[in-house]
């Protein structure tokens, strides 16, 4: 594979990881938000990175937890308060 094509593929993967599509949003009684996003390959580190990049959308909330429910779905829990 050509270097230019490889760089383009790498940038495409980064763009897909940085812009998860929120498919489900639910509030819990503790005023927490479960942000569900699709990423290419969901592992603990890629899910954490995806949640870290989506913090800009959830300003004023702290990341409480994150996990993968299957190979492509990442859950990020953002809560208000301490």
Curated annotation (Swiss-Prot):
Residues 1-26 form the signal peptide. Disulfide bonds join 32-79, 42-68, 47-74, 51-76. It comes from the Eukaryota. Belongs to the DEFL family. It comes from Arabidopsis thaliana. One of its GO terms (biological process) is killing of cells of another organism. This is Putative defensin-like protein 134. Keywords: Antimicrobial, Disulfide bond, Fungicide, Plant defense, Secreted, Signal. It is found in: Secreted. GO terms for cellular component: extracellular region.
């Amino acid at each position: 594979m050509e270097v230019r094509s490889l760089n383009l593929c790498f940038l495409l993967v980064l763009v897909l990881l940085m812009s998860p599509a929120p498919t489900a949003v639910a509030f819990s009684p503790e005023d927490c938000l479960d942000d569900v996003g699709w990423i290419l390959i969901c592992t603990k580190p890629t899910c954490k990175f995806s949640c870290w990049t989506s913090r800009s959308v959830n300003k004023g909330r702290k990341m409480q937890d994150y996990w993968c429910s299957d190979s492509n779905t990442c859950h990020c829990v953002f809560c208000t308060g301490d």
